[in-house]
């Protein structure tokens, strides 16, 4: 199990407190158990029966409050953990601008701010969630963060980036799995969606896709990775190569990372009240580097270091 370093954990805690306060303001004086009950209902709709997936649940104040008080911080930390892993491998490009697709109230963009991001375009179909994202970003600036956000309300299936726009990072956290979920051609349609937004990613920029670790979200993500092989992308993580996914070859086993995590007290309390296990972070994710310089960055570190040593000899 991997760990998150202390400095990053401290800043994640600052963002958590900001989002937590926004969630409390959204819902008035509801008792903790009432919020836990809302969380349990939301969790069942997203990861159990999945009846809430691809619906307008974030336009319901109660559901959005439960999300802000629980899932927001989890998405924040999962995205940050993946970015930290890429940084440790020396595969994280300079990040100043972010396109956050299916952003919800912005946890992924806030995570990117801890790795240099200064401005972000958030795209989501929920006006209420985008409003919460702007509120959180504004409070973040008052707390010393420097993230500027703009928003576009749009169904992702109809979204195309602004003409001429270029971003250092395109991130989709827990959103791609909701696209065309009942379509037999969902992998191809998700691939085509990624292709449609790639012109907005600069050469050398990072595409990061993060999903829950469950089998029904991990396997489709791995299948999407396979469908993107041979595009103008090179895989930077978790596997730093473009060979066929070894986990899919093992009868479709899920692939996910797990990080040690000491949940904030409010998260732990809600998890206990809702009957959820939250002793670590788990997420499936894939990261790609775009462009001609991507090939060198995407080679395994040992291979790159070996080549550098030979050149110095």
Roles of regions detected by a PLM:
Residues 203-211:
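Conserved beta-strand signature within the Rossmann-like core of class I S-adenosyl-L-methionine
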Residues 105-117:
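Conserved SAM-binding loop of SAM-dependent methyltransferases across substrates and taxa
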Residues 94-104:
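Conserved class I S-adenosyl-L-methionine
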Residues 188-204:
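A short glycine-rich, Lys/Arg-flanked "PGG" loop and its adjoining helix->strand segment in the class I
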Residues 267-313:
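C-terminal lobe and adjacent flexible extensions of AdoMet/dcAdoMet transferase-like proteins
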Residues 1-53:
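N-terminal auxiliary segments of SAM/dcSAM-dependent transferases
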Residues 168-187:
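A short SAM/SAH-binding and catalytic strip from SAM-dependent methyltransferases
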Residues 55-82:
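Class I SAM-dependent methyltransferase Rossmann-like catalytic core
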């Amino acid at each position: 199990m991997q760990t998150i370093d202390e400095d990053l954990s401290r800043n994640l805690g600052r963002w958590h407190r900001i989002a937590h306060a926004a969630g409390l303001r959204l819902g008035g004086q509801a008792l903790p158990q009432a919020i836990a009950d809302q969380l349990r209902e939301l969790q069942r709709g997203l990861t159990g029966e999945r009846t809430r997936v691809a619906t307008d649940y974030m336009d319901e104040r109660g559901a959005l409050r439960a999300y802000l008080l629980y899932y927001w911080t989890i998405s924040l930390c999962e995205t940050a953990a993946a970015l930290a892993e890429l940084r440790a491998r020396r595969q994280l490009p300079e990040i100043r601008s972010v396109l956050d697709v299916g952003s919800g109230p912005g946890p992924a963009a806030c995570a990117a701010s801890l790795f240099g991001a200064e401005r972000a375009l958030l795209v989501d179909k929920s006006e209420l969630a985008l409003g919460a994202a702007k509120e959180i970003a504004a409070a973040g600036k008052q707390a010393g963060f420097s993230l500027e956000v703009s928003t576009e309300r749009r169904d992702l299936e109809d979204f195309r980036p602004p003409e001429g726009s270029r971003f250092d990072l395109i991130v989709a956290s827990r959103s791609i799995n909701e696209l065309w979920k009942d379509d037999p051609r969902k992998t191809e349609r998700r691939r085509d969606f990624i292709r449609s937004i790639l012109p907005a990613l600069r050469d050398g920029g990072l595409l990061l896709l993060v999903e829950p670790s469950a089998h029904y979200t991990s396997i489709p993500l791995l299948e999407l990775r396979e469908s993107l092989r041979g595009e103008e992308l090179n895989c930077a993580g978790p596997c730093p190569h473009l060979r066929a996914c070894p986990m899919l070859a093992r009868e479709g086993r899920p692939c996910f990372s797990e990080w040690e995590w000491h949940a904030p007290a409010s998260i732990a309390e809600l998890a206990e009240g809702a009957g959820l296990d939250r002793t670590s972070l788990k997420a499936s994710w894939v990261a790609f580097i775009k462009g001609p310089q991507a090939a060198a960055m995407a080679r395994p570190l040992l291979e790159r270091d070996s080549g550098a040593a030979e050149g110095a000899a």
